[in-house]
């Protein structure tokens, strides 16, 4: 199994980012993890890609044994909807703004240090899903034309996102036969109201597309406990890890990624143990 984690790098200072990435690489080496995911936030983009990632940070990435995934513009909170134009926006102008931002990011990293995966979001929902889907497919076609073969993937989203509802996410995968995707377990479990049978149905439905599943973002959740909790915490009515792996997680190419405990090595070891032990059942 391939494992990775998101250390939660933030653009407070360049020195701090370098220190945290170096610590993350050391932790990945200790644990034998294959992938580090970096989140590119709005603030990082506004500061400038070369300002944030150039120099020592890029040197560390180029010299690392680990591969990198880039999580572009995570949907932070519903109050950020006005600032996020989204590649599925029904209006051409804001959609083109987001496409230009994505192309700048892809061009920068493809020229300096290509990512193993670029994880993108559809944006916030402002209209009927069918309207968003048409716009999203236009954007994906444009990106595929500009960057054929570049590894892009879409993910299911938090509440309020275009791809937050299971049926909508499945419809996108059905309509886009070449699209790779990332599955966030905590968000998906929350989307079915922590109903174990509904979650099992969603997993069975996703199994048809398992060969296109690039990454599982592991997080736990339960009623009253939030939707982004560590796996190793015991929660009443929490996520069924074993069922998730058994249904969609056995492909050795899938990256099992942890994003709830930062770069804390002992906690990452517990997260990995929770997945690994469930896979052996």
Q: Which residues does each PLM region occupy?
A:
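Acidic-and-aromatic substrate-binding clefts and catalytic sites of carbohydrate-active enzymes
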Residues: 10-20, 39-55, 76-80, 125-133, ...
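N-terminal pre-domain/capping segments
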Residues: 1-103, 281
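Hydrophobic faces of well-ordered beta-strands that scaffold small-molecule active sites
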Residues: 3-9, 36-38, 66-72, 116-120, ...
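An acidic, carboxylate-rich microenvironment
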Residues: 20-23, 168, 243
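Active-site acidic/histidine proton-transfer and metal-coordination neighborhood
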Residues: 62-63, 78-180
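Histidine-acidic metal/acid-base catalytic patches
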Residues: 1-2, 29, 99-114, 134-141, ...
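Alpha-helical context
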Residues: 4, 9-12, 81, 85, ...
């Amino acid at each position: 199994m391939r494992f990775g984690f998101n250390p939660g790098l933030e653009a407070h200072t360049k020195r701090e980012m370098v220190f945290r990435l170096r610590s993350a690489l050391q932790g990945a080496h200790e644990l034998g993890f294959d992938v580090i995911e970096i989140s590119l936030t709005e603030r990082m983009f506004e500061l400038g890609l070369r300002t944030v990632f150039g120099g020592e940070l890029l040197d560390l990435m180029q010299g690392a044994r680990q591969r990198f995934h880039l999580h572009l513009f995570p949907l932070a909170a519903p109050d950020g909807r006005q600032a996020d134009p989204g590649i599925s926006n029904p209006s051409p102008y804001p959609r083109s703004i987001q496409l230009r931002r994505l192309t700048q990011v892809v061009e920068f990293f493809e020229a300096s240090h290509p990512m193993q995966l670029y994880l993108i979001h559809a944006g916030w929902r402002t209209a009927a899903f069918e309207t968003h889907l048409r716009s999203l497919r236009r954007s994906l076609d444009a990106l595929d034309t500009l960057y054929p073969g570049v590894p892009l993937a879409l993910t299911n989203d938090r509440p309020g996102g275009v791809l937050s509802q299971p049926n909508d996410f499945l419809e996108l995968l059905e309509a886009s036969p070449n699209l790779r995707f990332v599955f966030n377990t905590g968000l998906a479990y929350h989307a079915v109201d922590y109903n174990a049978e509904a979650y099992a149905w969603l997993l069975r439905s996703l199994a048809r597309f398992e060969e296109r599943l690039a990454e599982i973002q592991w997080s736990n959740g339960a009623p009253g406990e939030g939707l982004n909790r560590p796996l190793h915490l015991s929660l009443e009515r929490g996520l069924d890890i074993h069922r998730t792996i058994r249904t969609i997680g056995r492909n050795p190419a899938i990256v099992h990624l942890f994003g709830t405990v930062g770069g804390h090595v002992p906690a990452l070891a517990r997260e990995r143990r929770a997945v690994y032990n469930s896979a052996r059942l």
